[in-house]
Amino acid sequence: MPLHLRMLFPAFTLATGFALGFIQPTGLLLGSAFAALLLVCDRYLPNWLWLMLTLLGGIALAAHLLPGFNPWQLWKPRRLSVDAAPYALRLSWDKLLLGTTLLAWWLAQAPRPAISHRRAGLTCVVTLLSVPLMAIALGLVAWQPKWPEGLLLWLAVNLGVAVMAEELLFRGVLQPALIKRLGVWPGVLLTASLFGAAHLPFSALFALLATVAGLGYGLVFLYSGRLSLAIALHAAVNLLHVLLLSYPLRLT
């Protein structure tokens, strides 16, 4: 896909957020600079510098550290599980921008060969079983089956914003770079560890769980060569969480 068409992804996100009043001029400027860095400067900057700036900018957007972005509250806080705190669904425009910009970059990357579809399938099954069971064993959640009102909206936001941005950043950008420098297993393991560390604000145990989940997502991408499968697996784990377990986390 030509660059001018791929640029429409972040441009539409910024224009929509600005028109609706959720992105301020400062956010518009910073978001445009990030999109230009990611999509244009990769051919002019040394690879290490582009990678470092992309990761720093990506983390800043994902962690809501840049000014000029206000979330869109789609649900008022409500209790989805009797043992969990009230949950409010929000659309984070900075994280959405990260995902759409990384998607525009990813569409220009060469396809990756598959190593083993059988291993990829087995990893999906193991991840879908082990992550929820580990979450229960660690006391992070309990068995709380439910069908929340507004589930489809939750799924659209979770998949289209959180999951897509996280997988494109960690598995799409970071994991291949680390594998190239460190080798396959060190690269996959370090990426999973950094993915887990990004969840430390929730708790150390949740970060450990995220590391295990991240290992599954990374191996699925490695074995299948398809980032879309890692995104689908990540979304499936999150869907099992909201449908079957305490959400977001069990109160202690």
Spans of model-derived segments:
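N-terminal, membrane-interfacial amphipathic/helix-forming hydrophobic leader that caps
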Residues: 1-110, 242, 246-252
